[in-house]
Amino acid sequence: MRGVLRGLAVVVEDVEFGRRLYKEGFYGRFLGYDKVKREEVDRINAPLVLALYEALYLVERGVLEVVTDSGEKITQTRLVELGREKLKNFDEIYKIYKYFRDLGYVVKSGLKFGALFSVYEKGPGIDHAPMVVVFLEPDKGISATDITRGGRLGHSVKKTFTLATVLKNTGEVILLGFSWARL
């Protein structure tokens, strides 16, 4: 099945295929809808919009083919190049996304929490995301104020505030989580 590259997103216009992707892993978001519960998916009649990193993940697994508006296939290599051209730190962000997905988590945008990702154990509408992930650029420090801000954010939304980065020399994903505790 295919999706069409449109700017920074890949649009799955086949509604049935979009529903299947969403049901199987909560990939993307339906155009015009916010959080959709699994039991509501069959009532949705809208295209599914995937972020570039989601589309790349599905392309790597042979689940999705990405094409241009004219139907020309975009290779996996070209999709990575486009990600690098359009998004700062695309490689690192994708590695973090892939890291959580490969562990079986559902990874959604964390924008409403001021974060890169919200990470669910089961999925939106089933459980609450126990973790918000903020990207820490490689070779960039973090201040005590940033940590305090993150801890407050995590506490206010009752989630673990997690810093994620990718080591330049090894490509390893490194996580550092903060949770509030009563002492």
Swiss-Prot record:
Its transmembrane ranges are none
* Active-site feature positions: Y120, H128, K159
Asked if the keyword tRNA processing belongs to this entry, the reply reads yes
EC numbers, comma separated: 4.6.1.16
Q: Name one GO molecular function term.
A: lyase activity
The reaction(s) annotated as catalysed by this protein in its Swiss-Prot or TrEMBL entry are: pretRNA = a 3'-half-tRNA molecule with a 5'-OH end + a 5'-half-tRNA molecule with a 2',3'-cyclic phosphate end + an intron with a 2',3'-cyclic phosphate and a 5'-hydroxyl terminus
According to the lineage, what is the superkingdom? Archaea
Fetch the Gene3D superfamilies from UniProt. Answer: 3.40.1350.10, tRNA intron endonuclease, N-terminal domain
Matching Pfam families = tRNA_int_endo (PF01974), tRNA_int_endo_N (PF02778)
* Xref: InterPro entries: tRNA_endonuc-like_dom_sf (IPR011856), tRNA_intron_Endo_cat-like_sf (IPR036167), tRNA_intron_Endonuc_cat-like (IPR006677), tRNA_intron_Endonuc_N (IPR006678), tRNA_intron_Endonuc_N_sf (IPR036740), tRNA_splic (IPR006676), tRNA_splic_arch_short (IPR016442)
Keyword line = Lyase, tRNA processing
Q: What do the Gene Ontology cellular component annotations say?
A: cytoplasm
How this chain assembles, per its entry, is:
Homotetramer; although the tetramer contains four active sites, only two participate in the cleavage. Therefore, it should be considered as a dimer of dimers.
User: HAMAP family, from UniProt?
Assistant: EndA_short
What PANTHER family has UniProt attached to this entry? TRNA-SPLICING ENDONUCLEASE SUBUNIT SEN2
Summarize the protein's role.
Endonuclease that removes tRNA introns. Cleaves pre-tRNA at the 5'- and 3'-splice sites to release the intron. The products are an intron and two tRNA half-molecules bearing 2',3' cyclic phosphate and 5'-OH termini. Recognizes a pseudosymmetric substrate in which 2 bulged loops of 3 bases are separated by a stem of 4 bp.
State the similarity comment.
Answer: Belongs to the tRNA-intron endonuclease family. Archaeal short subfamily.
Q: What is this protein called?
A: tRNA-splicing endonuclease
